Amino acid sequence: MRVGFSNPMLDACGYRAIMVTALAEEHYGEPGLFEAVIGGSFNPPIAAVRTDGVTTIALPERMRPADEKVAVRDGSIYLLSLLDAGGIDYAFEYRSVAEEHGLRWIDLPPAINLGSAEHADDYRRVHVNLGFQRFRSIGSERIGQPIVYAMTVPRNAPHPDEARMFVDFVLDAFREGKAGWPDPVRPDPEAATVYHATD
C-alpha cells in the first residue's frame, strides 16, 4: 500500500493527516500503526511519542521519504494526479476535495476525523511540532482540534462595508445549504458568528 499526504510544513492537510493517523493508532488499539503507515517510511524515522496522555510527533525540517510507501507533495491538491496515475493507492484529502473530484473515500469515525466538536478533547491529545517555524506569528506547534472554516474582514480593508456584505452573503449561503457546497463544510447556523472589529 502506498499513501500520499501533503507537506505538513506547507499545508494544514499534511499535519492533519499525521494527527489522524496518530489518533487512529489509539482509537483502534493498534500499537505501531503510525510507524507502519507514515513514521517508518522517513529518513530519519518520525516517531509518535506518548507521554502523560499526549502524543507528540516532532517532524524534521525536510520530509524525506526513505521508501516508496509514502509520497509527500507541497499541497494536498497535487496528490490527485499521482492518485489518478496509480502512483499512490490512498491520499489524505479533505472530504470536500474528494467529492469535488468524484473520488471514493473512506469515512473515518468521529473520534479520529477531526470533524466533531464532541471529540475536541481527544483531538487535543495529539501535537505535531513542525521542523521549522514558517510564520513568526503562529509558532511551530499544531495541536489537534476540529476543522473549521473561517472568514475575516481585515481592519485595513479598502472597502469594509462591501467586505462585510460579502461575508454575510457567504454565511447566508451556508445557512441555506446552497447547491454545490459540500456537506462537510456546512456549519450549524448557530455556530456562524461574525465579529466586526472597530478602530
Task: Place the predicted regions along the sequence by residue.
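Exported/periplasmic ABC-transporter solute-binding proteins
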Residues: M1-D199
